[in-house]
Amino acid sequence: MSRTCELTAKAVQTGNNVSHANNKTKRRFLPNLVNVTLISEALNQNVRLRISANALRSVEHRGGLDAFLAKADVKELSQRARLLKKQIAKKLAEQVAA
């Protein structure tokens, strides 16, 4: 399991700890990842994802997982999230047609 957000592609970054004497030591900046279960209203099912706390705030701000994925850039999404986006779009298209 990689340390990458499935919705925003936030990943591990590297940098330096810098002391008062300007000594530099390598370090890693880890994203704040949380395991969450989000509800897809279009698919009527629960979806487990590993996303950053920032992405969780964005999902809630946009009004849920379906709305977030509708606006999300495909390049940033994980393979699972891309599949979800397609399924949700297909389901919404069926509902509009019916």
Swiss-Prot record:
Domain of life: Bacteria
Coiled coil: none
Entry keyword annotation includes RNA-binding: no
HAMAP family in the record: Ribosomal_bL28
Disulfide bonds: none
Protein name (Swiss-Prot/TrEMBL): Large ribosomal subunit protein bL28
UniProt similarity note: Belongs to the bacterial ribosomal protein bL28 family.
Entry keyword annotation includes Magnesium: no
Example of a GO biological process term: translation
